[in-house]
């Protein structure tokens, strides 16, 4: 079964993999996430990147604080991302390609049983 058209909206997702890389072009460090969503009973993978350099992206700081992934020394433990579900907002760009516009930690009561993997 194939998904022919993924509708824009909010889906339940989990972090499948992550890595950190420094861009050769900009010199900035990025957290690259592979997020798997449950769309109509099928698993679909998306990529989402966050800049980790100071002052560049407050969104990832909020996510890491929500998953208790920041210690007293302000070091991030990205492994804690694996322990949570996320609300993944999918929209389409001008070229008609779906992408993640927003990623938020889902509270336990926000995750429906049929959305679990």
Task: Give residue spans per PLM region.
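Short beta-rich binding modules
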Residues: 1-117
